[in-house]
Amino acid sequence: MSSRKKKDAEVAQASVEVNPDLDVEELEGVGRVTGAKLKERGFFTVRDVAFASVKELAEVVGNEERALQIVEAARKMLGLHSFVSALEVYERRKTIRRISTGVKALDELLGGGIETRAVTEVAGEFGSGKTQLCHQLAVMVQLPEERGGLGAKAIYIDTENTFRPERIMQIAKARGLDPDQALNNIFYARAYSSDHQMILVDQAKSIIKQNNVALLVVDSVIAHFRSEFPGRENLAERQQKLNKHVADLLRLADAYDVAVVITNQVMAQPDVFFGNPLRPAGGNILAHGATYRLWLRKSKENIRIAKIFDSPYHPEGEVSFRITEEGLVD
């Protein structure tokens, strides 16, 4: 390749790297027909393909060899095809955004708030404050950055019919936001099954592309999976399906710079005689899938305790907060 052509290629490469939403048909090896098939399955852009698995694309294009070529081309265009230095990773982490929880002590525990490009799991018993925290985050993300938000919208997937717009309005009013506008900035969907839940996550990608969305809530992530796959005989199938769902959430968070918050139920350990007999549901799939894991528990009256019990770099610790009419406060 001549120096001129090489330079032109580098310029073209750079232009694509800052435009991950380039139409999928611009990819090498993807024409109009293949592009139409990919779009039918939700792969609209170079970014969508770059974060997909070869197996997913093979189901669309017909074979794994061609799927691998397309995925590698997309990743190369976005600069995701090779190793980078740890310093580059560090510099990239500096661009991660955080959403304040509205509770100063909890923000400090989390290193500044809920991170984008990560999945934060919130586990705890019924009434421990999981859904309350989700409601508050859906409001907090709308605040300007100087007040702890990102000036953005939220997507809320409700699996247990616990979303209450009235609660959003209370919290929004307490934070100085117009209650009606706060509701208008939340894209809500009720999931009626695990399949429906996973479809909604796929649909969320289109909403994120077309709107300034920085938060995706799934409350709760495990409910439908537990009810649809009861008993040990169905456990393997359940975990396999749950694994795909969590992987989709992780990819979405990273690809679109979104904070993903999932709530989780608890289960009893009958063989535990000392300490807390409860543990988060979902087994190793959620344990390894979530980036950060919070445990909420009740204390006296309206006080709740939040403990971070799994994190790549946060030390374990716990703080208390109160649930009031205005929302969660120190």
From Swiss-Prot:
It comes from Pyrobaculum neutrophilum (strain DSM 2338 / JCM 9278 / NBRC 100436 / V24Sta). ATP binds at G124, E125, F126, G127, S128, G129, K130, T131. Gene3D superfamilies: 5' to 3' exonuclease, C-terminal subdomain, P-loop containing nucleotide triphosphate hydrolases. GO terms for biological process: DNA recombination; DNA repair. SMART domains: AAA. Involved in DNA repair and in homologous recombination. Binds and assemble on single-stranded DNA to form a nucleoprotein filament. Hydrolyzes ATP in a ssDNA-dependent manner and promotes DNA strand exchange between homologous DNA molecules. Coiled coil: none annotated. Keywords: ATP-binding, DNA damage, DNA recombination, DNA-binding, Nucleotide-binding. GO terms for molecular function: ATP binding; ATP hydrolysis activity; ATP-dependent DNA damage sensor activity; damaged DNA binding. The gene is radA. This is DNA repair and recombination protein RadA. The keyword DNA damage applies. HAMAP family: RadA_arch (MF_00348). The keyword Transferase does not apply. It comes from the Archaea. Belongs to the eukaryotic RecA-like protein family.
